[in-house]
Amino acid sequence: MSDQIIARVSQSLAKEQSLESLVRQLLEMLEMVTDMESTYLTKVDVEARLQHIMFARNSQKMYIPENFTVSWDYSLCKRAIDENCFFSDEVPDRWGDCIAARNLGITTFLSTPIHLPDGSFYGTLCAASSEKRQWSERAEQVLQLFAGLIAQYIQKEALVEQLREANAALIAQSYTDSLTGLPNRRAIFENLTTLFSLARHLNHKIMIAFIDLDNFKLINDRFGHNSGDLFLIQVGERLNTLQQNGEVIGRLGGDEFLVVSLNNENADISSLRERIQQQIRGEYHLGDVDLYYPGASLGIVEVDPETTDADSALHAADIAMYQEKKHKQKTPFVAHPALHS
């Protein structure tokens, strides 16, 4: 193998690039070494029995189309693998029944299968020409080398994608309350920063509703933690259904939830209070017990984001909630054995 090819391969591998970018460079070099008109990479779906041409280089009159799919069972590549014949300069005579080869005018064909490091079959790396070309050991070596490099790169990209997906899942998990599926405290505070910035830009005020579920500890103590968890889950589901554009709804932790809304001409504290209470108040089915819940303690404040930051607004809503809890008439929940069990 010439020093020029080795140098170009080394340069290509040293760059951070996509699979497509790498393959296109290798196809160009493969064309130089094999003296073929077309070089191309295919991916094979063995279950569907289809071969897909992913990337192709065509420098002369022969044209191998990209994004072209053929039957795997009737392809040149499968014939080459089945017969262990990876080079032929007599394709019309040897594989004259191959319609694709006949339509493309292929006379000389060189290919090698690509197996990923885990042993799975990926596809083929090929070179073809409408004219007779001689086989060379150098061309065979380069073809095998490039097939191995592509296999390694495909495996690397797959691993990187798995890492990306795992990282995205971890990020999503870190921003989600595991019990209710609502945004958690971390997500709430980050969304608040964005919401306050938006409100300043729109010259809107912000309403913050701090929600404390009265008698939640009593529900837990009397009916067990499973019933308590079901209660929290159902409260979260109900709050989620009232979400409107420009609102942040989440669980701060324990029995505390938060609703933050961009104020507009059609909204006020009393209407937001009623929306929330209507959602929370009502029947809950908690496994072996049905429970009528009269409502939560709400602390709702309206703030100007130009003069009040998110932390101060939350603190004010928290104080307002405790003031309501302190002065509200105690209305116990009513529970009875579940009729649906």
UniProtKB/Swiss-Prot annotation:
PROSITE patterns: GGDEF (PS50887). InterPro entries: Diguanylate_Cyclase, GAF, GAF-like_dom_sf, GGDEF_dom, Nucleotide_cyclase, Rev_trsase/Diguanyl_cyclase. The active site is at D255 (proton acceptor). Residues 18-154 form the GAF domain. Its EC number is 2.7.7.65. Induction: Expressed during exponential and post-exponential growth at both 28 and 37 degrees Celsius. Mg(2+) binds at D212, D255. Pathway: Purine metabolism; 3',5'-cyclic di-GMP biosynthesis. Its cofactor is Mg(2+). Residues 204-337 form the GGDEF domain. GO terms for molecular function: diguanylate cyclase activity; GTP binding; metal ion binding. GO terms for biological process: cell adhesion involved in single-species biofilm formation; negative regulation of bacterial-type flagellum-dependent cell motility. Substrate binds at N220, H225, D229. The keyword Transmembrane does not apply. Coiled coil: none annotated. Binds 1 Mg(2+) ion per monomer. GO terms for cellular component: plasma membrane. The record marks K217 as: Transition state stabilizer. Keywords: GTP-binding, Magnesium, Metal-binding, Nucleotide-binding, Transferase. It catalyses: 2 GTP = 3',3'-c-di-GMP + 2 diphosphate. It comes from the Bacteria. Catalyzes the synthesis of cyclic-di-GMP (c-di-GMP) via the condensation of 2 GTP molecules. Cyclic-di-GMP is a second messenger which controls cell surface-associated traits in bacteria. This is Diguanylate cyclase DgcP. It comes from Escherichia coli (strain K12). The gene is dgcP.
